[in-house]
Amino acid sequence: MRIVVKVGTSTLTYENGKLNLEIMEKLVRQIANLLNRGEEVVLVTSGAIGAGMGKLNLKEKPKTIPEKQSLAAIGQGLLIEIYEKFFNEYGKITAQVLLTKEDFSDRRRYLNVSYTLSNLLKWGVVPIINENDTVTVDEIKIGDNDTLAALLASLVEADILIILTDIDGLYDKDPRIYKEAKIIEVVEEFSDELFKIAGSAGTKRGTGGMYTKIQAAKICWNSGVKMIIANGKIDNVLNQIANGEKIGTTFLPMKKPISSRKVWIAFNAKVSGRLFIDEGAAKAIIKHGKSLLPSGVVKTEGDYDVGDCVAVVDHQEKEIARGLINYSSEEVEKIKGCKTHEIEKILGYKYYDEVIHRDNLVILERGEKFGS
């Protein structure tokens, strides 16, 4: 079984920002045990900024990007050094992998990351992964390690993603506010209500709250990966989950997941523009799985070229799909609203009948934006 484990800042650190070495040691011991029983494990770890805070004895997380990046530069080396020390005690080898959004949005780099991680796992190495917080800016930032873990789980075709946090799972209400809140044990479908329940609350030391974890679960759901949210401080939590015991909240994957290529289009590819389409075209795409023809395009935004990823927006201005475009933005501007047989007359040539072929088109349920 291939497992991706994500552990958050709130689990790895104390309230004062310093690393909880006891928790880290227990986590490493559990992962080492999983390796001993034949499982493959990728570890996505937060904590670099928290480790930097502890090193400098800072009590509050700075808000400016340069300060956060400086703390990450201090903390990342410390974090990996501690992990390596603990894993060495169990005879396990680790490899540090720092990623940015471009490693996912660029198809060639995306595949290269896949090959690298596959080799590491084949050799029995534990890849320890974090976003490269020291150099990333908003334009190339993934944003949170929940999303990073989900993208990686899809990339390595994991069987399960386990997100360890400081609460026991997804509740029907915020358990920090409502004592009567009940845990949701299993989620099979995604709805607006589920995202409302998740809210947007995080912790002082973490980046994302439950909302980012639901977004991560959505990526896993489409990718055919089971995801579990559990409390990282439960004794032997990873081994209990690997043994099939019910802990936390389990998000079951869709029965017919989309292809790995379409997962890349939906969640990883950089969006270079937007196509606004009419109601008829939206219905044809969503209800009947049709390709997008130029006749259904009302407006185009952005500067994109052939093969770029664009967002498809319906008449209610909701993003309903993403796809790889067959024509440039200049060409689409000329042929929008036209019939297929008119393309050659207008442009002087015709590449395809479709603006986006259905094989390169991914429907986004709930009309929600994923990535950017």
Curated annotation (Swiss-Prot):
Native source organism of the sequence: Thermoanaerobacter pseudethanolicus (strain ATCC 33223 / 39E) (Clostridium thermohydrosulfuricum)
Catalytic activity: L-glutamate + ATP = L-glutamyl 5-phosphate + ADP
UniProt keyword terms in alphabetical order: Amino-acid biosynthesis, ATP-binding, Cytoplasm, Kinase, Nucleotide-binding, Proline biosynthesis, Transferase
One GO CC annotation: cytosol
Pathway per the UniProt entry: Amino-acid biosynthesis; L-proline biosynthesis; L-glutamate 5-semialdehyde from L-glutamate: step 1/2
Domain PUA: 272-350
Role played: Catalyzes the transfer of a phosphate group to glutamate to form L-glutamate 5-phosphate.
HAMAP family per UniProt: ProB
Protein name (database record): Glutamate 5-kinase
Gene3D superfamilies on file: Acetylglutamate kinase-like (3.40.1160.10), PUA domain (2.30.130.10)
